[in-house]
Amino acid sequence: MSKLAEIEALLFVAGEDGLKVHQLAEILSLPPTGVIQSLEKLAEQYEVNPDSSLTLLETSKTYKLVTKPEFAEILRAYSRAPINQSLSRAALETLSIIAYKQPITRVEIDDIRGVNSSGALAKLLAFELVREDGKKEVIGRPNLYVTTDYFLDYMGINHLDELPIVEETELVAEESQLFIERTDIDENQ
């Protein structure tokens, strides 16, 4: 497996947070100059490949995989699509965690789920089931996420206190199942 592929995989998993050169260097046991050379090569590969929708973005010394600007219109159309398509299990787990733990950061969601939740969170934001609600007052000031009024409407409740009470250990598995059942009911109506 090439270092280039490893960097690409790490950037993919890092999602919107991206990674800094020193983080990549530490994870891959490479010198920072080697990481920079690999990042430059990866960026060039994306730019010359007309069949790739991805590009490498560097902001504030943080590298991220993002879609090329020419795909903005189709991505906008996707984000505006009605929620008649089912949410993935990852999105449902993420939504249930936010509903019960809000306000909560993406990293806190990741810690509960045990995997990166960037993609699921992006979908929930696009569907307007959750929204950003300020920043947590810790180093890095990460965004805090909460559910929206649309979430309440979608779930058929008026207040968050109408959500079923669950034990902490049951939160991810049981509550995501409740959301799955709710979306199944909606699809069958």
From Swiss-Prot:
This is Segregation and condensation protein B. It comes from the Bacteria. One of its GO terms (cellular component) is cytoplasm. The gene is scpB. Gene3D superfamilies: Winged helix-like DNA-binding domain superfamily/Winged helix DNA-binding domain. Keywords: Cell cycle, Cell division, Chromosome partition, Cytoplasm. It is found in: Cytoplasm. Homodimer. Homodimerization may be required to stabilize the binding of ScpA to the Smc head domains. Component of a cohesin-like complex composed of ScpA, ScpB and the Smc homodimer, in which ScpA and ScpB bind to the head domain of Smc. The presence of the three proteins is required for the association of the complex with DNA. Participates in chromosomal partition during cell division. May act via the formation of a condensin-like complex containing Smc and ScpA that pull DNA away from mid-cell into both cell halves. Belongs to the ScpB family. One of its GO terms (biological process) is DNA replication. SUPFAM superfamilies: Winged helix' DNA-binding domain. It holds the Pfam family SMC_ScpB.
